[in-house]
């Protein structure tokens, strides 16, 4: 930025010096000239000048046109006769001589080949044709290429076809149409071998390019049918219909052979019939989708069965482990099963609680034993006594037992708060089960206390002492 600012300052100073006005006034003499002529004369002078300027422009193109005409007249007689006279006769003579020599050699070779191939041909006719070929080369080419071949083909079709139909058996006559209708490559090879024995028939019934494409399409179709994908395609292209087609073709071939030796009709290749291809593709896609859905459903069913088996096995292992733990540890008469099953066992007429405990341990919940052990149940070595005299000392319980009441605390010392909590939980479970308030069982697990007894309400006649 600094050098730019310096350059700008320098330029401003230099321009200021140039524009400095002189201190003294400068007197410049000025002469005023007055035109006495009217201003209209100026316009006339300008128009005359324009007219003079236009005149030489009109003269110039005339001179150019004259020069162009002179040049054309000079160029035309010199160039045209040289081009027309010199090259034409030389080129025509040379081309004619070369063409005649080539045509004569080609015709001689063709005539010799025809003589070798057709020994029955007449030599006089060939000589006449050779003389005509020398005179008219172009016409003879067309006659050699088109009419002779057609005549030979018609003779071959008429003479040997009748002999073959009479001499050969009925199976060999069906060979030619079987090439196009049978998709099997083995039959195609057999038909080709049979045609090799009779080259004349092969020339008369040579397959066209469209028929070759049909054989290729049939071969590809056979490969697809032999592949695993063909199982899907065979559902939409039944085999009985395909087997019936050759039989009908044989009948038609027999009729045609009896009437006249007609060439078989070309079959439509697969790629020229798009509707059938589209329908078969759609059906194949639908079959593939259905098979995929079936496979996925089977896989999901297998996964579900496997998961259920794992769950059952895991539950069985847990039940076996918890069952061993209950047999070794839990000796309390409290059953590990559900509460409703316990109530049914207690009030169903079973007077012995220990007898009702083992079937309750085999309940559907395998973790009930661990929950009961952690809930406050402890091993009890001393047997529980249930005197009837102590039951009368307890006041009657009118309502539900709350955890804050002191009725349970009278029989349980303060040091056994955990046991008291377990008893309260048992009472809560009875409340949830819908047991009447007159049939409540209070369990005290401390065997050292004198008041260690299960106190039942006198109204509950079927209560079991623990």
Swiss-Prot record:
One Gene Ontology biological process: imaginal disc eversion
Source lineage: Eukaryota, Metazoa, Ecdysozoa, Arthropoda, Hexapoda
Q: Give compartment(s).
A: Secreted
Q: What is its main location?
A: secreted
Composition-biased stretches, type Basic and acidic residues, lie in 124-160
Q: Where is this region: Disordered?
A: 55-94, 119-220, 378-435
What is known about what this protein does? Probably has an essential role in embryogenesis, induces morphogenesis of imaginal disks, and may participate in multimolecular aggregates.
List the biased-composition ranges (Acidic residues): 404-416
What's said on domains? The regions 203-253, 256-333 and 335-377 are thought to contain either alpha helical or beta pleated sheet motifs.
Q: Where is the composition biased (Polar residues)?
A: 185-194
Q: Provide the protein name.
A: 20-hydroxyecdysone protein
Which residue stretches does the UniProt record annotate as biased composition, category Low complexity? 170-180, 203-216, 379-394
Placement of sequence repeats on the sequence: 48-50, 53-55, 58-60, 70-72, 74-76, 78-80, 82-84, 90-92, 94-96, 98-100, 102-104, 106-108, 125-127, 139-141, 148-150, 155-157
Q: Where is this region: 16 X repeats?
A: 48-157
- Which residues, if any, are the signal sequence? 1-16
Q: Which residues are glycosylated?
A: 294, 352
Q: Which of UniProt's keywords are assigned here?
A: Glycoprotein, Repeat, Secreted, Signal
Q: Name one GO cellular component term.
A: extrinsic component of membrane
Q: Which gene encodes it?
A: ImpE2
